[in-house]
Amino acid sequence: MSSSIDIGISQDQRQQIADGLGRLLADTWVLYGKTHGFHWNVTGPMFNSLHGMFDTQYNELWDSLDEIAERIRALGMPAPFGDST
């Protein structure tokens, strides 16, 4: 009995998709960090609206990080983290 389900995508194709998702995961991680930094450091007359906007954005990015990593795992590949890429 096979431990994986045949979804009609070859191993090579799954690897290519996972590699692309891995790059998306890395880019999203960078954007998450930068957005969080802006949230912490925003000043000025638009502080309240920008602070709230950045809060919403970094929380949504966090959810996206989890979703992207889980999609990589669903393809049967390990989700990259740290120096694993």
Predicted regions and their residues:
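A generic "alpha-helical surface" signal
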Residues: 19-22, 26, 52, 59
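Disorder-to-helix initiation segments
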Residues: 2-24
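Mobile beta-alpha loop/short-helix "lid" or hinge segments that flank ligand
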Residues: 36, 84-85
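Long, well-ordered alpha-helical segments
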Residues: 24-40, 68-71
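Conserved alpha-helical segments that form or flank metal/cofactor-binding pockets of metalloenzymes
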Residues: 42, 46-84
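Helix-loop segments that flank and shape redox-cofactor active sites
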Residues: 8-16, 31-56
